[in-house]
């Protein structure tokens, strides 16, 4: 039901906002700066999946309604058998009214819950600004976890949580639409446990708590199978 509602949002402004920054977000070859950090960043970024997520957010077939879009998740690609999401998104942005040279696919095996926030955000901001906004949210959540852990005299939790982050390609997680979803959910879960550990432990609610976290991860994370 929620996906149907977001598919009722106008895609015109979303497409224009994506077009503003698609060149900056999908650099290749000579477009990548020569410094070592930029080369590392662009070589390891999850642009393949991010491009699919963004294009899913701005797709709209004139002969399909919101329910059909939410159910089947239509997606145009330049290739019929091998997906080329970065090039396909660029081509789609250049001429989204003319898709005669593209192949229509369906991507129905995932929940695509990320569209609940990605579509409204792209309605208001460019793709680049959405990434910066997610970066700010992640930094704010990490600071919140650190402060709460110190106040609860449980600094070890903060140390372990933030320490583990260093082993997860931290820079890439912070600027990736794909990777940031699980990290944000993890930080929210840790924060909730810090605030409500006694109640969760005394009432034996941890199994249900982790079940809810798993459900949310499966729903919002693009790469988690239902």
Where are these regions (language model features)?
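Membrane-interface micro-motifs in multi-pass membrane enzymes
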Residues: 111-112, 164-198, 202-206, 223-225
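Hydrophobic, membrane-inserted alpha-helices
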Residues: 115-118, 139-144, 161-169, 210-217
């Amino acid at each position: 039901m929620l996906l149907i509602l977001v598919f009722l949002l106008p895609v015109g402004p979303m497409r224009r906002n994506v077009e503003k920054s698609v060149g900056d977000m999908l650099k290749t070859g000579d477009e990548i700066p020569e410094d070592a950090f930029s080369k590392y960043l662009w070589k390891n970024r999850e642009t393949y999946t991010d491009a699919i997520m963004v294009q899913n957010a701005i797709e709209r077939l004139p002969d399909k309604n919101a329910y059909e879009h939410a159910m089947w998740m239509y997606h145009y690609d330049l290739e019929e058998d091998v997906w080329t999401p970065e090039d396909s998104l660029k081509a789609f942005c250049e001429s989204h009214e003319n898709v005669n040279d593209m192949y229509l696919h369906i991507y129905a095996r995932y929940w695509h819950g990320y569209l609940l926030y990605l579509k409204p955000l792209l309605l208001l901001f460019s793709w680049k600004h959405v990434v910066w906004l997610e970066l700010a949210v992640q930094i704010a959540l990490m600071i919140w976890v650190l402060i709460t852990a110190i106040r609860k005299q449980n600094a070890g939790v903060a140390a372990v949580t933030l320490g583990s982050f260093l082993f997860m390609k931290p820079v890439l997680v912070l600027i990736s639409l794909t990777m940031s979803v699980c990290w944000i959910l993890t930080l929210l879960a840790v924060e909730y446990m810090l605030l409500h550990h006694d109640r969760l432990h005394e009432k034996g609610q941890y199994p249900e708590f982790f079940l809810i976290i798993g459900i949310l991860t499966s729903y919002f994370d693009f790469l988690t199978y239902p």
